[in-house]
Amino acid sequence: MDQNEIETLQYYLKEYGQQAEVFAGQLELMENGRMEALAAIEALEALATSEDGTVLLQIGGGASLRAKVLEPEKVLLNIGSEVIVEKTSVDAIEYLKDRITELEASQKKVSEALEKLRAQTNEIAKRLEQGYRQAPGGSPVPHRHDHEDHDEE
């Protein structure tokens, strides 16, 4: 394996690593969205069983207020692109359940893509290791001429 092939493999290894980070970030965002939807469903269901419509409203910093929901049957939902629609509590719960199903399907696809990417990354790493062993001197570091500025002030 020549130096150019080693450098090409190193480039692909770096690129695949960056893609894996993007996929992992997407998975995290999807999981956060799924958890928020589950929490919203739980809150709507609890509100439906509340006798007087009083809820704890978190206002940040660990502080909460007791608040009375004036219209517990009317839920405002952000459906994307800053579009807000009003739905009944039951319809909102159904919408959120559908959103969870979509998120889970997307998570599965991204997880599968991430697994394929990791398999390719492992294969490239193996090929690089072979290349390093075959390279003169067995050095895993490509020969670069880095200029250090130790003498400049």
From Swiss-Prot:
What is said about its interaction partners and assembly? Heterohexamer of two alpha and four beta subunits.
Region span, Disordered: 126-153
Question: Which protein, by its recorded name, is this?
Answer: Prefoldin subunit alpha
A molecular function GO annotation: unfolded protein binding
What keywords sit in the KW lines? Chaperone, Cytoplasm
Q: Where is the composition biased (Basic and acidic residues)?
A: 143-153
Gene3D superfamilies per UniProt: 1.10.287.370
Provide the organism lineage as a comma list. Answer: Archaea, Methanobacteriati, Methanobacteriota, Stenosarchaea group, Methanomicrobia
Family of this protein = Belongs to the prefoldin alpha subunit family.
One GO BP annotation is: protein folding
Please give the chief subcellular localization of this protein. cytoplasm
Location in the cell reads: Cytoplasm
In the UniProt record, what gene is named as encoding this protein?
A: pfdA
Q: Which InterPro entries match?
A: PFD_alpha_archaea, Prefoldin, Prefoldin_subunit_alpha
